[in-house]
């Protein structure tokens, strides 16, 4: 009526033809609804907008309690279905058959967990301020495992469609565990298999998106991104729970940093790094398995991946910033330059015009440079400090002469292994400590008024008139490099990672020194990591290792002591022994051991275990005798008595257990009683004692009759106070 009362609309409604073919085609071709909202409106205005299977007539009454009709006897035109009222849905929801809900929380696990996190999360106040968002690749799917798409597909097929044809290879540990777990959970599950498959995919695969983010990037923050940051506002939020995938990422970074730092100071960094990666577990899963599946990009993690022969991102790292070249090219030439202190540095100069994006945790920038010249640097960051960090890194990276001339004093920074850093890192460390001279000498220039950009003065204050030459501060962040492309890299024994053109992408100098506490338990089985928990842990672990491996240690002690002394498991222990005493202690203990080997019946298991770690240092020949040996633990020197117990090393004869600094270090399986009872493991020169008497080898010989044995031949021999033991003549002569 309304429309007909207005002349213009009446004209349209009465005169306009609707038989225009194009229009009819537009709204009728294809199965896709062209105007869903409108369709919904006029459908719901009808009495029976829904169609249902004929069986519904047996399952639902014709009228509800209020007497309203629930279905019509008319068939749906063009199909064998009944027309049904929306009220029927209400009736069904209230009175329809119920089904077991036990599987819902299991199948829709990710949703149920999300609800819990939001329920227990805390939303703080809303602040209005400019948001510097930068696009980063983020994990949008909390609570997932880290399977590859293919691995997940095999697991899903095996769980949801176990009888389908097709080869499925479940190889990795995580695949097998998940499959077993899910099959048990989903027994007799009535939820549509396709739905279950979709939900499993959410649980198994990491989904990433390239999204603008200003705050936290872990998946529990990303799931509420739309609630926590807009264009000009942010809302504080603390998640109401953590998810394993974020914990894995965080713990992986900590483990990788610890391992790289430790490997740097060992004799063969690369071999040590690999040994540690292979023997470390994070939250009960092997670190190498996590590295293969986890896409986290962080300097230490990438060094570990490179060592394992995995591909990594082609961007490179300098001063804690990720650099990605976006255009231009350069060749590298060695050049000698003089610092302000007239020290000569050999630097690899990049000749040519290049543009880079620089992305750090708290600042980002665009850098344009020519040979040893910064042309333009546009920085944005969270605060003055972060912006200054980015400017320093870019100035050093530019290799400009005024930067090198700004050096005051000598450059002699060393890494953890006491090796001098390369010149570029020398310069970086120097200016990171104090950049005053650098900023003062850089030069300033007047600036034009450009929207969203301000200048920055040498004292790091903003200005609209002047700015450091070539440097501007922007309100907008620079997006992270979005590509997930991975390249083949090589790594040398000093853990420098290069791409195939030989450019250094990463080196241990780039690994952050930040210490954190891991969310998941990291178990380092490698002896190289014993010291991470301090000297006490080194002491306990060393003795635990000897006791665990006592059977082999015992044989080596008598046959091949040099090989035993050189075992890497004794390396950490040396740091506990006062430097001046190491050689003397070692000489003393080795002499003592040799006497034990030579003189029958003086073999004393406990004493060997106690003194063995001291014999690992290069020995000094001296006539020094010691009644106690000092180790530095608990901030002071503590004594280990050569004969007898002490708080550091205490063996309880009754329980046969050893405690080191009050911590249990294990039990000795054989009877290490002093004197004759220990004679079974005593060592005869030229013979190996195998154990108790074995009648198969004939009657006991006296010690003098042994001379007639051939090499490798076994015999029973009578020694000491009537003890009979089985011995074998050594295959090679060595005392």
From Swiss-Prot:
Subunit comment: Influenza RNA polymerase is composed of three subunits: PB1, PB2 and PA. Interacts (via N-terminus) with PB1 (via C-terminus). Interacts with nucleoprotein NP (via N-terminus). Interacts (via N-terminus) with host MAVS (via N-terminus); this interaction inhibits host innate immune response.
Keyword Translocase recorded: no
Entry keyword annotation includes Transport: no
Descriptive protein name: Polymerase basic protein 2
Gene3D superfamilies per UniProt: Polymerase Basic Protein 2, C-terminal domain
Function, in words: Plays an essential role in transcription initiation and cap-stealing mechanism, in which cellular capped pre-mRNAs are used to generate primers for viral transcription. Binds the cap of the target pre-RNA which is subsequently cleaved after 10-13 nucleotides by PA. Plays a role in the initiation of the viral genome replication and modulates the activity of the ribonucleoprotein (RNP) complex. In addition, participates in the inhibition of type I interferon induction through interaction with the host mitochondrial antiviral signaling protein MAVS.
InterPro entries recorded: Flu_PB2_2nd (IPR049110), Flu_PB2_6th (IPR049114), Flu_PB2_C (IPR049115), Flu_PB2_CAP-bd (IPR048298), Flu_PB2_middle (IPR049111), Flu_PB2_N (IPR049106), PB2_helical (IPR049113), PDB2_C (IPR037258)
Gene Ontology cellular component terms for the protein in this record: host cell mitochondrion; host cell nucleus; virion component
Family the entry assigns: Belongs to the influenza viruses PB2 family.
Sequence motif Nuclear localization signal, residues: 729-732
Assigned keywords, A-Z: Cap snatching, Eukaryotic host gene expression shutoff by virus, Eukaryotic host transcription shutoff by virus, Host gene expression shutoff by virus, Host mitochondrion, Host nucleus, Host-virus interaction, Inhibition of host innate immune response by virus, Inhibition of host MAVS by virus, Inhibition of host RLR pathway by virus, Inhibition of host RNA polymerase II by virus, mRNA capping, mRNA processing, Viral immunoevasion, Viral transcription, Virion
GO molecular-function term, one example from the UniProt record: RNA binding
């Amino acid at each position: 009526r309304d429309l007909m009362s207005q002349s213009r609309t009446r004209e349209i409604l009465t005169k306009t033809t609707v038989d225009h073919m194009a229009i009819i085609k537009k709204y009728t071709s294809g199965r896709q609804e062209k105007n869903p909202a409108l369709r919904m409106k006029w459908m719901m205005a009808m009495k029976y907008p829904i169609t249902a299977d004929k069986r519904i007539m047996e399952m639902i009454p014709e009228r509800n309690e209020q007497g309203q009709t629930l279905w019509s006897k008319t068939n749906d035109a063009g199909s064998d279905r009944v027309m049904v009222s929306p009220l029927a849905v209400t009736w069904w929801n209230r009175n329809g058959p119920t089904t077991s809900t036990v599987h819902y929380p299991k199948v829709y696990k990710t949703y149920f967990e999300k609800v819990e996190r939001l329920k227990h999360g805390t939303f703080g106040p809303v602040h209005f301020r400019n948001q510097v968002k930068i696009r980063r690749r983020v994990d949008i799917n909390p609570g997932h495992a880290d399977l590859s798409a293919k691995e997940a597909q095999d697991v899903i097929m095996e769980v949801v469609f176990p009888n389908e044809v097709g080869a499925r290879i479940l190889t990795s540990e995580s695949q097998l565990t998940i499959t077993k777990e899910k099959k048990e959970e989903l027994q007799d599950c009535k939820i549509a298999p396709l739905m279950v498959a979709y939900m499993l995919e959410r649980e198994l695969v990491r989904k990433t998106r390239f999204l603008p983010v200003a705050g936290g990037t872990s998946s529990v923050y990303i799931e509420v991104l739309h609630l926590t940051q807009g264009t000009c506002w942010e809302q504080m939020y603390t998640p109401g729970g953590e998810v394993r995938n974020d914990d894995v990422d965080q713990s992986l970074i900590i483990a990788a940093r610890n391992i790289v730092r430790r490997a740097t100071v060992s004799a063969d960094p690369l071999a040590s790094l690999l040994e540690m990666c292979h023997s470390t577990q994070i939250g009960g899963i092997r670190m190498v398995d996590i590295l293969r599946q986890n896409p986290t990009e962080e300097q230490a993690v990438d060094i570990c991946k490179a060592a394992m022969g995995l591909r990594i991102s082609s961007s490179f790292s300098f001063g804690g910033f990720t650099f990605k070249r976006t255009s231009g090219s350069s060749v590298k030439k060695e050049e000698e330059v003089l610092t302000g202190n007239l020290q000569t540095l050999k630097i690899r100069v990049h000749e040519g015009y290049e543009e880079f994006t620089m992305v750090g945790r708290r600042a980002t920038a665009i850098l344009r440079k020519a040979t040893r010249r910064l042309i333009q640097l546009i920085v944005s960051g969270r605060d003055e400090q972060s912006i200054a960090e980015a400017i320093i890194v870019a100035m050093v990276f530019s290799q400009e002469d005024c930067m090198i001339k700004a050096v005051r004093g000598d450059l002699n920074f060393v890494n953890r292994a006491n090796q001098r850093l390369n010149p570029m890192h020398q310069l970086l460390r120097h200016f990171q400590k104090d950049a005053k001279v650098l900023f003062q000498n850089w030069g300033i220039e007047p600036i034009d008024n450009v929207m969203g950009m301000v200048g920055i003065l040498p004292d790091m204050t903003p200005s609209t008139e002047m700015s450091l030459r070539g440097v501007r501060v922007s309100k907008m962040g620079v997006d992270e490099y979005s590509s997930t492309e991975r390249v083949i890299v090589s790594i040398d024994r000093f853990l420098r990672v290069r791409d195939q053109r030989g450019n250094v992408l990463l080196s241990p100098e780039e690994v952050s020194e930040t210490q954190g506490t891991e969310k998941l338990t990291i178990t380092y089985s490698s002896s190289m990591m014993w010291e991470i928990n301090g000297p006490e842990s080194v002491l306990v672990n060393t003795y635990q290792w000897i006791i665990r491996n006592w059977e082999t240690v015992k044989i080596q002690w008598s046959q091949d002591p040099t090989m035993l002394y050189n075992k890497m498991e004794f390396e950490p222990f040396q740091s506990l022994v006062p430097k001046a005493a190491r050689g003397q202690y070692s000489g003393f203990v080795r002499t003592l051991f040799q006497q034990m080997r030579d003189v029958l019946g003086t073999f004393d298991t406990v004493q060997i275990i106690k003194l063995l770690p001291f014999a690992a240092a290069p020995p000094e020949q001296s006539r020094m005798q010691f009644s106690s040996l000092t180790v530095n633990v608990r901030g002071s020197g503590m004594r280990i008595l050569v004969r007898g117990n002490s708080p550091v090393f205490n063996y309880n004869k009754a329980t046969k257990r050893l405690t080191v600094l009050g911590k249990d270090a294990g039990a000795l399986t054989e009877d290490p009683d002093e004197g004759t009872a220990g004679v079974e493991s005593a060592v005869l020169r030229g013979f190996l004692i195998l154990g108790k008497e074995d009648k198969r080898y004939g009657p006991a010989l006296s010690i003098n009759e042994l001379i007639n044995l051939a090499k490798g031949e076994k015999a029973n021999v009578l020694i000491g106070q009537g003890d009979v033991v089985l011995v074998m003549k050594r295959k090679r002569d060595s005392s």
